[in-house]
A protein has these predicted regions:
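Conserved active-site and SAM-binding loop architecture
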Residues: 1-229
Length: 229
């Protein structure tokens, strides 16, 4: 499946979708440091094929990708749904931009992530109005045996006629069973990004904001494995 990765960060979510067999064909990421990491990872051969990286989702046109992209993924920012924002939309609310891209691309499925239940509920409501069925799950890194929490809500959306496609995924994700026993062999707090740049603050910010690949892949697998899909 061809993936359009929104809010791609430094590539944690993209590594998860690589585990699931996706092929990233385009990414969107505003942070310059994360874009540098994504470019370096492509040069390192971490991804199946090279892909373009757009900077600002607010200027990204998804229409040329209709018919090419099968799945849109993204951990959209949660600032607009924080307690400080009192759940009100602000200039930081970028879910409407992700929703716009989904409408333009019309993907076969959508996989989204957020730390806020309110944000995920809003996304689910909007996607259901667009004709998708949705499933959500709460899963943290600690649930897979890590010594840090990183609690996240994960949302999978798909049209009724794609149920067969998702069942096929179920047969491909058995390798994720037992992943928690092997993925935490090193302390994530000591992670290093070997990209030749010494931007420690930016590196830690990217790690802190990013998705844990094993958690993202497992969340997708669990959502697909639900009996009513």
């Amino acid at each position: 499946m061809n993936e359009l990765a929104l809010f791609a960060g430094a590539g944690g979510g993209l590594l998860a979708t690589q585990m699931l067999g996706f092929r990233t064909v385009c990414a969107v990421e505003l942070d310059w440091y994360c874009r540098c990491v994504l470019t370096q990872r492509q040069n390192d051969g971490c991804f199946r094929t090279p892909f373009p990286i757009w900077d600002d989702i607010r200027t990204f046109d998804g229409r040329p990708w209709r018919g090419i992209v099968d799945v849109v993924t993204g951990g959209f920012p949660c600032q607009a749904y924080s307690s400080a924002a009192a759940g009100k939309n602000t200039a930081d609310d970028l879910w409407p931009e992700m929703r716009r891209v989904v409408a333009d691309v019309a993907p076969r499925c959508v996989f989204a992530e957020n730390v806020s239940r309110v944000a995920i509920d809003q996304a689910a409501d909007d996607l259901e109005q667009m004709g998708y069925k949705t499933k959500a799950i709460l899963l943290s890194a600690a649930d897979l045996g890590a010594d840090h929490i990183r609690e996240r809500y994960w949302l999978l959306a798909y049209p009724d006629n794609e149920s067969k496609l998702l069942r096929q995924f179920h047969a491909k994700v058995g390798f994720l069973q037992g992943l928690e026993t092997s993925v935490w062999s090193s302390d994530p707090r000591d992670s290093r990004i070997s990209d030749g740049m010494a931007y420690r603050v930016e590196r830690y910010k990217a790690i802190g904001n990013g998705q844990v690949p094993a958690v993202a892949a497992t969340a997708f697998a669990l959502l697909v494995a639900r009996g009513d899909i």
